[in-house]
Each structure stands twice: as structure tokens, then as C-alpha cells.
A protein has these predicted regions:
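Well-ordered alpha-helical segments embedded in enzymatic catalytic cores
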Residues: 40-47, 68, 90-94, 108
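Short coil/turn segments at secondary-structure boundaries
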Residues: 6-9, 61
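Conserved helicase motor "Helicase C" RecA-like lobe of SF1/SF2 P-loop NTPases
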Residues: 56-86
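Conserved interdomain hinge at the start of the Helicase C-terminal
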Residues: 22-61
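Segments forming glycine/polar-rich beta-alpha architectures that bind adenosine-containing cofactors
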Residues: 1-5
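Conserved RecA-like P-loop NTPase helicase motor core
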Residues: 12-20, 24-36, 80-82, 86-157
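Structured helix-beta-strand junction loops
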Residues: 51-52, 76, 98-99
Length: 157
């Protein structure tokens, strides 16, 4: 058996100084997919985008919800809004070339997209993406005392 070596490099990014995690405390419980839920999400997104003067990437797990929120905000946001409905390098390039832009995205924009510098100063994640369970992860989940302990240990490290 070969020896495995590991090297963990320090990040040049100072997370403590440069990041803020915002979790709204005033979220109401709404029926999933309801108009009330969509309006509540749109209101929070509107406030956050305006407080950062654009420069925002808004990630959704649902194209349907993304489209509804986009439609609600398109005339309300004072910054250029760009929506990526499927993998669209053209729209991502347009976002990179547009000052103070806001990019609404789902699917392919969750991984492998680079926005260097201050192009994105605010990242809004509407809902965390959870992968479709597979037999191995299901068996692993059963080794935990509760679903909450599994989520805290594996899903949200």
C-alpha cells in the first residue's frame, strides 16, 4: 500500500475580515412553492442586492422559482439583471462585462464558474442543493443516531 501525502495550503482570502453570513430571522413558514414563499424570497433578495449595489450572484436550486423571482424583480432592481436558464457561457460573459450586474442562475452555475476580483461581492444562496440520495449515502445515513446529526456531520460540515 502506498503512503498518501496531504498538503493543506492556507487561503490568501481572509474570510473573517471579508465575509458576512446573513441568515434572515424573520422568515415565515410558507407552503413550499406558494406565491407567499416566492414573494418573501423576492423581498429578501431585493434588499440584499440593493445594499450591495449589484455585484450579486443569486443561486437557485429550481429554475421555476428562479424564473418567478426574476419576473417579480426585473422592474424593481436598479441594476442590470441577467438570467442563466441553462448552461449559457454567453450570459456569464455578459455578466462579467457588465458593471454592477446581478446574475440569477441555477444548475450549471453552482460549480466551475469563476468570477475573479470584485465581480461578485454578494452571493445569495436561496436554498442549499442536496443531491439525490444513492444507496451508499442512504446506508451511511443509517449509521447516525438522528437525521439532524447526519446533516450536521456530512451535509453541512
Amino acid at each position: 500500500m502506498q503512503r498518501v501525502r496531504e498538503y493543506v495550503a492556507d487561503s490568501p482570502f481572509e474570510y473573517q475580515k471579508n465575509c458576512l453570513l446573513y441568515l434572515p430571522k424573520d422568515l415565515k413558514r410558507c407552503r413550499r412553492g406558494s406565491q407567499e414563499e416566492t414573494e418573501m424570497i423576492a423581498d429578501h433578495i431585493h434588499s440584499l442586492i440593493c445594499s450591495t449595489y449589484g455585484h450579486t450572484l443569486v443561486l437557485f436550486t429550481s429554475y421555476h422559482l428562479m424564473g418567478n423571482v426574476y419576473q417579480m424583480l426585473r422592474d424593481e432592481i436598479p441594476f442590470p439583471m441577467i438570467g442563466v436558464w441553462r448552461h449559457s457561457p454567453e450570459e456569464i460573459t455578459r455578466f462579467k462585462q457588465t458593471d454592477n450586474a446581478v446574475l440569477f442562475a441555477a444548475g450549471s452555475c453552482w460549480e466551475g464558474v469563476d468570477f475573479p476580483g470584485d465581480m461578485v461581492s454578494s452571493l445569495i444562496i436561496v436554498k442549499l442543493p442536496f443531491a439525490v440520495p444513492d444507496p451508499i449515502s442512504e446506508a451511511e445515513k443509517e449509521t447516525y443516531d438522528s437525521l439532524e446529526s447526519y446533516i450536521q456531520s456530512i451535509i453541512v460540515p
